[in-house]
Amino acid sequence: MAITKDDILEAVGAMSVMELNDLVKAFEEKFGVSAAAMAVAAAPGAGGAAAAEEQTEFNVILAEVGANKVGVIKAVREITGLGLKEAKDLVDGAPKPVKEGVDKAAAAEAKKKLEDAGAKVDVK
């Protein structure tokens, strides 16, 4: 006699959380799959446009230094906490990221400080 889908559902429904955990591990081992990988694979189909609208991490990029290089170096030091040499190297290497993975408010604040110093800034 073959086991039906309903029989399997009844058996799974009667299992405790620990038994279900063991069952999932057994499936992963037997079939060479991962329950986590399936969840990740389903996420991209959710819509890339919605993810772009809800961006939570931003990168502040120093695009151009402008005429006031000293002021920009001071602003970079204030924003990043870098030493004078490191800040100067960052400014000389523009375009370069000043801050990465910051929230929207921190990115806006950094952009304002750099623009007030005369730099051209991109937030991505």
Curated annotation (Swiss-Prot):
GO terms for molecular function: mRNA binding; structural constituent of ribosome. Signal peptide: none annotated. Gene3D superfamilies: 3.30.1390.10, Single helix bin (1.20.5.710). It comes from the Bacteria. InterPro entries: Ribosomal_bL12 (IPR000206), Ribosomal_bL12_C (IPR013823), Ribosomal_bL12_C/ClpS-like (IPR014719), Ribosomal_bL12_oligo (IPR008932), Ribosomal_bL12_oligo_N_sf (IPR036235). Keywords: Ribonucleoprotein, Ribosomal protein. GO terms for biological process: translation. It holds the Pfam family Ribosomal_L12. One of its GO terms (cellular component) is cytosolic large ribosomal subunit. Belongs to the bacterial ribosomal protein bL12 family. Forms part of the ribosomal stalk which helps the ribosome interact with GTP-bound translation factors. Is thus essential for accurate translation. Homodimer. Part of the ribosomal stalk of the 50S ribosomal subunit. Forms a multimeric L10(L12)X complex, where L10 forms an elongated spine to which 2 to 4 L12 dimers bind in a sequential fashion. Binds GTP-bound translation factors. This is Large ribosomal subunit protein bL12. It comes from Cupriavidus necator (strain ATCC 17699 / DSM 428 / KCTC 22496 / NCIMB 10442 / H16 / Stanier 337) (Ralstonia eutropha).
